[in-house]
Amino acid sequence: IRAMIFHLGVLRHLAENGALETISRVSTVSGGSLLLGLVFKECGYVWPSSDQFLSLVYPALRDQLCAKSLQWGAARQLLRPANWRYLLSRSNLLAKALQHEWGVTAELSQLPRAPEWSINGTTAETGKRFRFKRDSVGDYTLGYSAPGEFPLADALAMSAAFPGGFGPLSFEAGNFQWKKRPAWDSPLESAANV
């Protein structure tokens, strides 16, 4: 929650200086990802103006962050027997809490084109950065895929995962068509199926 509060303060500072309108790219991890997901949810999944952030988003999120617990929300998901399979994949429980208790119901593909948002996490298999964006998911080692109907809440939960707290997010990688470029700086057209 500390990271979320910190990022809420940073966005407030930017809004007070009329700077939210100048942002073209945002890269987040952990609490920053969770907070930005809630900002988008509060604005109908569009980027807020500085005035909109100060008058609507900031007060709403300040109140919600003081009244709700993401950790207890994730634990409450175990009251549903269908979620028992996630006992060891607690990030999946966090994703369910974001959907059911915080209302984060959009898919990655529903995010706006601007600002370009990179939601970052780490793969358990390689330890490399795994990135979620509006139009792609993946990393340079495993490859990239179109997100399809991938839930924003799942991407946020994966970004917030950490050992001992919320473990890795479990999802079916076989549901995606992965592509990889032969080299980091190769043209996108050179990507081949993995």
Model-identified regions with their sequence ranges:
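Active-site gating loop/helix substructures
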Residues: 67-85, 100, 111-194
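Short secondary-structure boundary micro-motifs
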Residues: 10-11, 105-107, 114, 154
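Conserved loop->alpha-helix
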Residues: 95-98
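Residue-identity detector for threonine
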Residues: 22, 28, 105, 122-126, ...
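Surface-exposed acidic, glycine-flexible loop patches that form ligand/cofactor-binding
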Residues: 17-20, 102-112
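Patatin-like phospholipase
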Residues: 2-88, 92, 133-134
